[in-house]
């Protein structure tokens, strides 16, 4: 197989990136990232519109602004509310976009807001964002009390309305309890194997297996500090894929790059919220000696090369195309409505 063969496989694939963070700011330069993603051959991306520190009012305003932008640029982008919207956008040469919320605090303990956010285009939501909230335990906490009563209600309501439950950033016990009560596939849209790198944001093999048993997908993230010594190379991304595919099969692996277009601005905003100011703990062995500008993130342009690396490692065309996005489309077909 040649690089040309890999390019053909990539061009014909439905390429999905399930996590583009930092889209809630008003900086117009961020939209250049969307154009880069579209130009790189990606078919679908899910953009973060709010995090656990946002209020419901802030979240709705952000969603309104992003929806207006998509309407004004409908020749390039389309709001994806169904799996068919993704397929249609691929045929039209447009980038399909859905929204995500990283954490459930923006609900402000109102279960009815899940359906409201769904109608505004939110297609997956994290239960927590590193810290405890009213739903469950965060992945950065020393202890995890599991899902509370409201947390169980949230999982069931998300299943009902057709919103993917995203367990990234969530504590172990809360994740496993969510798997027990869910009636639809659950996923980790941007999480890497703990077995490969000891980092509080990474997930254990038992969590990967539980995700696969639910019918879900683990999205490999391209954050260098979550893969090794600040290494965001394409080969390192494929190493994450190899581990997950070897454990549960390639049908349960996807991509959630979590690419940050402006490291310095992102980390300044992140650390401006005291409860979430945990950046030095992202990888204690490495990040203490790095400035935010030095944090490595895999870029959308690396995805074509990822297809080539997977081909060299023996993945067949079907597996490559499913990992690049077909597996996420399968989950969307089953959940989104």
Would you name each region that the model predicts?
Residues 68-72, 143-161, 178-188, 306:
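Alpha-helix-loop-beta-strand connector modules within alpha/beta enzyme cores
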Residues 110-114, 171-184:
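Distinct, well-ordered alpha-helical segments
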Residues 115, 156-159, 164, 210:
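Feature for exported/extracytoplasmic and membrane-associated proteins, marking the mature portion
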């Amino acid at each position: 197989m040649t690089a040309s063969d890999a390019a053909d496989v990539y061009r014909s694939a439905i390429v999905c990136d399930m996590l583009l963070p930092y889209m809630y700011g008003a900086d117009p330069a961020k939209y250049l990232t969307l154009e880069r993603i579209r130009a790189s051959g990606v078919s679908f991306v899910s953009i973060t519109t709010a995090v656990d520190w946002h209020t419901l009012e802030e979240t709705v305003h952000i969603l309104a602004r992003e929806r207006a932008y998509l309407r004004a640029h409908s020749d390039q982008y389309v709001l994806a509310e169904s799996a068919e919207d993704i397929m249609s956008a691929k045929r039209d040469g447009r980038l399909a976009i859905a929204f995500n919320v990283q954490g459930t605090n923006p609900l402000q303990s109102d279960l009815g807001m899940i359906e409201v956010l769904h109608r505004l285009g939110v297609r997956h939501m994290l239960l927590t964002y590193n810290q405890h909230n009213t739903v469950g335990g965060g992945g950065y906490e020393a202890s995890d009390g599991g899902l509370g009563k409201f947390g169980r209600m949230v999982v069931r309501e998300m299943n009902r309305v057709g919103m993917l439950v995203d367990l990234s950033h969530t504590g172990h016990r809360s994740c496993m309890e969510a798997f027990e009560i869910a009636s639809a596939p659950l996923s980790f849209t941007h999480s890497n194997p703990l077995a490969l790198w000891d980092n509080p944001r990474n997930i254990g093999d038992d969590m990967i297996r539980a995700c696969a048993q639910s019918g879900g997908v683990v999205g490999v993230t391209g954050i260098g500090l979550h893969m090794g010594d600040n290494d965001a190379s394409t080969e390192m991304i494929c190493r994450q894929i190899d581990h997950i595919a070897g454990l549960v099969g390639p049908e349960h692996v996807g991509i959630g790059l979590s690419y940050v277009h402006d490291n310095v601005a992102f980390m300044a905003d992140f650390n401006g919220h005291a409860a979430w100011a945990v950046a030095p703990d992202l990888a204690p062995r490495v990040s203490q000696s790095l400035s935010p500008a030095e944090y490595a993130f895999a870029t959308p342009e690396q995805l074509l090369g990822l297809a080539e690396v997977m081909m060299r490692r023996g993945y067949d065309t079907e597996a490559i195309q499913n990992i690049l996005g077909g597996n996420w489309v399968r989950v969307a077909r089953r959940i989104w409505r």
